[in-house]
Amino acid sequence: MTARVRFLLLASAAVLTLSACNRDREPAADGAVPAAPGAAVTPAEAAAPLTFSEKTAFATVSLKLPDDIKAQPDLHAKVYAQEVAHLREFAEGAQADNTEAGAPNLAYEQTVELVAAHETGKLMSLKRTAFEFTGGAHPNTVMTGVLWDKALKRQVGWAEIFTKGADFAGLDRALCAAINAAKRARVPDAEPVALGGKDWACPRAAETPFVLAPGTTGGKAGGLTFLIGPYQVGPYAEGPYEVTVPLSAFQSLLAPAYADEFAGSLAKVATTTP
């Protein structure tokens, strides 16, 4: 396996781990990523600052966390440790790639930022955006969500929020309609997408990262904002989309344990950010 392939596998694994809260969790894994021996987080770093940065001849990496995360120290420590380990693996991969090429000829870059999306009585929702450049025609941006149960002190996701075996066909259609509305708002002559499309297709809701959307009822979520990256529903030039679906599209599908975290209508009517 070449160093380039090894690096890409490491990067992909780390991204999937942080978005595990929006997927079915593996038994007993709970989103943990063991750091590589050369990428260990020191005891001092385990105190979990809000920022991290490092620059070498081969890569520049940085992390920024929101002030809100300090209220959940277990989440804070977990996210910081995972992200720092991943960024160091990225930097090591950059060095390996350039060493294999014979000389440092391209500086890689990765920046990761988490921002507070919304918070309810039980749940804290964060949006994670990772910007990455490793050469090629353009950088890559990946958005994922982190959902934290404040009482249980663990990440939760689709499998916990929704009833097992629920039929999401209606939610899939609502998400697809919202995506097309967002595409038309941004690019009036954009080609519409559909579920099962050939070139571009609407994603299934259960397979799409999300964050909680603010509602008109205090301390509750009024919907879900789905995070859709470049290339998913259109050309790269269209950019990413953050598409919000109201509670009415999925309220009957919520699991009893979290149904009371949702109420009201959306606080913001727009279906996507500018």
Language model: regions and residue ranges:
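Bacterial N-terminal signal peptides that target proteins for export
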Residues: 1-9
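Alpha-helical transmembrane segments
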Residues: 12-15
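C-terminal motif of bacterial Sec signal peptides marking the signal peptidase cleavage site
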Residues: 17-20
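Compositionally biased intrinsically disordered regions enriched in Thr/Gly
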Residues: 22-274
